[in-house]
Amino acid sequence: MGRRRRRLPREPFEIAITGLSHEGRGIAHHDERTLFVHGALPGERVRAVYTKRRRSVAEARVVEVVSPAPERIAPHCPHFGVCGGCSLQHLTPERQVELKQSVLMEQFHHMGGVQPERVLAPLTGAPWGYRRKARLAVKHVPRKGGVLVGFREKHSPFVAEMDRCPVLDPRVGERLTELGRLIEGLSIPDRVPQIEVALGDETGALVFRNLAPLTAADLNRLAGFARDSGLAVYQQPGNEATMALVHDPVGRRLDYALPGHGVRLGFRPGDFTQVNAEINRAMVDQALDLLAVEPGQRVLDLFCGLGNFTLPLARRASEVVGVEGAEALVERGRENALRNGLDNVRFYGADLTLAAADQPWATGGFDRVLLDPPRSGAFEVLGLVAALGPKRIVYVSCGPATLARDAGELVHRHGYRLTAAGVMDMFPHTAHVESMAVFQREAQD
């Protein structure tokens, strides 16, 4: 017979917060345990209750702030603390960015044994209404009056009860209640678990995941919402290949512009694109400035997606090669190059975790390389990248630990210097750390 799990004590207890974790939780010590406290900041005294407790580590949440820290602010969103979409709204935006910068530098030190020669100024933008890509949870809850649409609760798998979301682009963030009513009126309100949000500059799309067939009346209802909202509506009964258009009131592809580089990039609802258009524009500008591509040079863009960096690079370089593992994005990159009239760029599909020197794209050497890998990093391809001879590498990262690991490899094994690094606040009010680093060969160009 298994051991019974001990019940957590329900009584609040008072503690002093001494630090802040990488995830934005307060750190304290209580009952001979390291305690991570949701909603607490360094220097505060708070009353908290346990949410999880193990032998040496425990978690808790704040029920009362006894003495607040100077950087504490009132959360903008009334759902903060319950909704799991944000974790840092109680912290000033400036301090949020400082936290992310410190996380990056700590990871460089601990994971890579390196430090940048120069810290880049953080890229920041509008803190609200920035999010263009999201996966919204949906739950039919008759006892709460219908269908809930939003993010899941911080401390449970339930969907948070929310009427709006201020971090979402208002084209969707102001329509959560409307979306709930829409689904409630379908014949299968309990069989629609998710809505995928994909927004471009002027157009947008919602993909309704349906686990049972929609009736003709359901499709008419969804089409009516599309006409009223101006957003294209899709249904998806199975995997991504089953996605089918219900109605597009605009009849234009999803796309976004990079005005500083004279390109527009089209995409489909299921494609990967950056969630924050303002930061994405600043990120592309900074990456190209740091690469410092000169006329006549060849550039390699690894993990290139649909051409977010590739096409702007093609405006400056003699030749650009983009390599991506997802074939759908490779095709999108080619389409985008054609639409933008760029004939000096080639896209290849390849699994970059199995990079080998005999790849058709890995020929001729490159003057510059841009890396934009997933959270798992680019470790497997670094040896090949170094062998291709680029004097400068710009690495765009969504995982500070893997960036730091890869930085250590480039510096200690392959003879590069980490000349600069800094953060980009792609996800304000969350603990997500996006960053950029520049590597230079010891021989100056």
UniProtKB/Swiss-Prot annotation:
Protein residues bound to [4Fe-4S] cluster: 77, 83, 86, 165
Listed name of the protein: 23S rRNA (uracil(1939)-C(5))-methyltransferase RlmD
NCBIfam families membership: PRK13168.1, rumA
UniProt entry keywords in alphabetical sequence: 4Fe-4S, Iron, Iron-sulfur, Metal-binding, Methyltransferase, rRNA processing, S-adenosyl-L-methionine, Transferase
Function: Catalyzes the formation of 5-methyl-uridine at position 1939 (m5U1939) in 23S rRNA.
Residues that, per the record, bind S-adenosyl-L-methionine: 274, 303, 308, 324, 351, 372
Homology family: Belongs to the class I-like SAM-binding methyltransferase superfamily. RNA M5U methyltransferase family. RlmD subfamily.
Top EC class, one word: transferase
Assigned EC number: 2.1.1.190
Keyword Transferase: yes
InterPro entries: 23S_rRNA_MeTrfase_RlmD (IPR001566), MeTrfase_TrmA_AS (IPR030390), MeTrfase_TrmA_CS (IPR030391), NA-bd_OB-fold (IPR012340), SAM-dependent_MTases_sf (IPR029063), TRAM_dom (IPR002792), U5_MeTrfase_fam (IPR010280)
HAMAP family: 23SrRNA_methyltr_RlmD (MF_01010)
Catalytic site positions: 398
Signal peptide positions (record): none
SUPFAM superfamilies: Nucleic acid-binding proteins, S-adenosyl-L-methionine-dependent methyltransferases
GO molecular function, one term: RNA binding
TRAM domain ranges (all copies): 6-64
Reaction(s) catalysed by this chain's protein: uridine(1939) in 23S rRNA + S-adenosyl-L-methionine = 5-methyluridine(1939) in 23S rRNA + S-adenosyl-L-homocysteine + H(+)
Native species: Alkalilimnicola ehrlichii (strain ATCC BAA-1101 / DSM 17681 / MLHE-1)
GO biological process entries: rRNA base methylation
